[in-house]
């Protein structure tokens, strides 16, 4: 794949280029230090991915991303910045990933792998594949693989695979993950729109679970189920969601 690094700091560009050169999926790397140079390169070249800083000297990387998205063959955008406060806006622009400085090899490789997987899915979209795969690849929310949440004026980037469940009680949404739990004032509906339906199942009007974290399913009162998830989190499937739950897990 061909990558473009956009950053007005030479040291940051050099560091990122070094790490990308260690990745076998990257065949060619070019650099740009400002908006004008970036747009010129995008006009005459085709890139698979662009690593984009947010604080550029002549313009915001967010504004540049908006311009890139309007291009006919726009590359996958990966924001590479020292500022986490723009994460929500970045994902609203359908960014593939959001990486914080200082860069780490593993994190860079993860971002490159996301682009590689997205390209493979795009190539296979016209092939005959299973309904489960179609559901996941057609769901644009699954392309980023992360959920940005804001807690106490700080934005946390959660990988979908780390999220165990989301539940609401008294207007507070609790997000349980494999590492810790978070509480936010955003509605469950707000997060439901950002989560891929291929991975997350709504089992109650106030609860969404990650089906990959379901450990056991027990018969419960009134012909319902009780679920035990990772870290022994327990949730009940309400009767009104039983049919959908069984269908999504292939229990019928």
Curated annotation (Swiss-Prot):
Post-translation changes: Phosphorylated by LytS.
GO cellular component: cytoplasm
Source domain of life: Bacteria
Residue stretches making up the Response regulatory domain: 2-116
Annotated compartments: Cytoplasm
4-aspartylphosphate PTM sites in chain numbering: 53
A Pfam family matched in the record: Response_reg
Keyword hit for Phosphoprotein: yes
SUPFAM superfamilies on file: CheY-like
InterPro entries (UniProt xref): CheY-like_superfamily, LytR-like, LytTR_DNA-bd_dom, Sig_transdc_resp-reg_receiver
HTH LytTR-type domain mapped to chain residues: 147-251
Molecular function GO terms recorded: DNA binding; phosphorelay response regulator activity
Keywords: Cytoplasm, DNA-binding, Phosphoprotein, Transcription, Transcription regulation, Two-component regulatory system
Location (main, coarse): cytoplasm
Known role: Member of the two-component regulatory system LytR/LytS that probably regulates genes involved in cell wall metabolism.
PANTHER family: STAGE 0 SPORULATION PROTEIN A HOMOLOG (PTHR37299:SF1), TRANSCRIPTIONAL REGULATOR-RELATED (PTHR37299)
The protein, known as: Sensory transduction protein LytR
Taxonomic source organism: Staphylococcus epidermidis (strain ATCC 12228 / FDA PCI 1200)
Gene expressing this chain: lytR
């Amino acid at each position: 794949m061909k990558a473009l690094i956009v950053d007005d700091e030479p040291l940051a560009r050099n560091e990122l280029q070094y790490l990308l050169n260690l990745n076998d999926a990257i065949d060619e790397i070019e650099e740009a230090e400002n908006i004008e140079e970036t747009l010129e390169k995008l006009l005459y070249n085709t890139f698979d991915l662009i690593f984009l800083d947010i604080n550029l000297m002549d313009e915001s990387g967010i504004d540049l991303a908006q311009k890139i998205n309007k291009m006919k063959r726009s590359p996958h955008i990966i924001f590479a910045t020292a500022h986490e406060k723009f994460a929500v806006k970045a994902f609203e622009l359908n960014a593939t990933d959001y990486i914080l400085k200082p860069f780490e090899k593993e994190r860079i490789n993860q971002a490159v792998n996301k682009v590689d997987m997205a390209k493979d899915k795009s190539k296979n979209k016209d092939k005959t594949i299973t309904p489960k795969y179609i559901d996941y690849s057609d769901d644009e929310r699954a392309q980023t693989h992360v959920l940005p949440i804001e807690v106490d004026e700080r934005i946390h980037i959660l990988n979908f695979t780390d999220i165990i469940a989301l539940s609401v009680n008294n207007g507070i949404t609790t997000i349980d993950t494999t590492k810790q739990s978070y509480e936010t004032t955003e509605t469950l509906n707000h997060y439901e729109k950002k989560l891929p339906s291929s991975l997350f199942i709504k089992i109650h009007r106030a609860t969404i679970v990650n089906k990959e974290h379901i450990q056991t399913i027990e018969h419960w009162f009134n012909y319902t189920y009780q679920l035990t998830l990772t870290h022994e989190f327990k949730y009940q499937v309400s009767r009104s969601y039983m049919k959908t739950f069984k269908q999504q897990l292939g229990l019928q």
